[in-house]
Curated annotation (Swiss-Prot):
Subcellular location: Cytoplasm, Nucleoid
Main function: Required for nucleoid occlusion (NO) phenomenon, which prevents Z-ring formation and cell division over the nucleoid. Acts as a DNA-associated cell division inhibitor that binds simultaneously chromosomal DNA and FtsZ, and disrupts the assembly of FtsZ polymers. SlmA-DNA-binding sequences (SBS) are dispersed on non-Ter regions of the chromosome, preventing FtsZ polymerization at these regions.
Iron-sulfur in keyword set: no
Name of this protein: Nucleoid occlusion factor SlmA
Gene giving rise to this polypeptide: slmA
Listed GO biological process terms: division septum site selection; negative regulation of division septum assembly; negative regulation of protein polymerization; regulation of DNA-templated transcription
A Pfam entry, by short name: SlmA-like_C
Leader sequence segment: none
Family according to the record: Belongs to the nucleoid occlusion factor SlmA family.
Domain HTH tetR-type: 10-70
Additional note from the record: Inhibitory activity is enhanced by sequence-specific DNA binding.
Length: 198
């Protein structure tokens, strides 16, 4: 029984990995059908549906992976690092680095892969970015408590500016078919962001 469960879990993971790889390839710039995905995995469409009730559920699973990966790591950064600017820098690097290491998932983060899918999937991505922006806002607000002084610019505006930078770099990565990596020239770009943190 345990072997059957393990085999099923492995097949589910194989399906999700194939979907992510297809999103990374030129197929990712078009709608991915279950027929194409089944062919990529080497199974029938019926076999796909034994593991996932719908393609939407496959995207849900990938979004859950993205959420778990990013939120868990952001929480670790907040636990381990106390300096406000260092926290922000690490969170930005996390977002950009995650996108760079997972090009197919970046198509999901930018909404590109979800254009032909159910609207609620885009809603989940929107909620994820709202959570990240809320975390950034909290980091910025904690500076006042931790260091006794805040910023001259509203923390809400600063948080949205930082997140807009990240989203822009991820969109550029997808638009360029993964030619322009989000972390390219980060050490030169970060001072431009940090200069706004006054």
């Amino acid at each position: 029984m345990a072997e059957k469960q393990t085999a099923k879990r492995n097949r589910r993971e194989e399906i999700l990995q194939s979907l992510a790889l297809m999103l990374e390839s030129s197929d990712g710039s078009q709608r991915i059908t279950t027929a194409k995905l089944a062919a990529s995995v080497g199974v029938s469409e019926a076999a796909l549906y034994r593991h996932f009730p719908s393609k939407t559920r496959m995207f849900d699973s990938l979004i859950e992976f993205i959420e778990d990966s990013l939120i868990t790591r952001i929480n670790l950064i907040l636990k381990d690092e106390k300096d406000t600017t260092a926290r922000l820098r690490l969170i930005v690097l996390l977002l950009l680095g995650f996108g760079e290491r997972n090009p197919g998932l970046t198509r999901i983060l930018t909404g590109h892969a979800l254009m032909f899918e159910q609207d609620r999937l885009q809603g989940r991505i929107n909620q994820l970015f709202e959570r990240i922006e809320a975390q950034l806002r909290q980091v910025l607000r904690e500076k006042r408590m931790r260091e006794g002084e805040g910023y001259t610019t509203d923390e809400t505006l600063l948080a949205s500016q930082i997140l807009a930078f990240c989203e822009g770099m991820l969109s550029r990565f997808v638009r360029s078919e993964f030619k322009y990596r989000p972390t390219d020239d980060f050490d030169a770009r970060w001072p431009l962001i940090a200069a706004q943190l006054q």
